[in-house]
Amino acid sequence: PKRAKNTMSTESTSIRIPVLGSVPAGIPLEAIEDIEDWEEIPREWTKGDKDYFGLKIHGDSMYPKYMDGDTIILRKADDCESGDECVVYVNGYDATFKKVIKKMDHIILQPLNSEYEPIMIDNNDENNPVKIVGIVVELRRKL
């Protein structure tokens, strides 16, 4: 009798990434121990040395698109396009998740929830530097 060929690849098409409960500043993402969960992403996303992590949303500043308890998948990045939704450090250690709007002389960290005020940061303000940590590529919500 003919044997069925094994068409399953030995290499998995997905990889596991950590979902962090928070993004404390000053610690390389690889060293953070506040891992709440694990998510799988397509292996092809990581081509070209791209790195990803997940983050649990705490709070409602990005409601209604993102809700408390949602998981966002982010691509690590140190820059972004204006309009990207990013996790950023403000003043070196406060991590926040906002829409980043780049203007000529300042950056606006825009919450999606109108109950919250946007944060405006002057590009020349050395006391409040904005550092991009990651750009949202996917939202995952448990029903």
Short names for language-model regions:
Residues 80-87, 96-98:
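Short, Lys/Arg- and Gly-enriched loop/turn segments at beta-strand edges
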Residues 70-71, 84:
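Structural motif
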Residues 73-74, 87:
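Hydrophobic beta-strand signal
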Residues 88, 109-112:
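SH3/SH3-like beta-barrel fold
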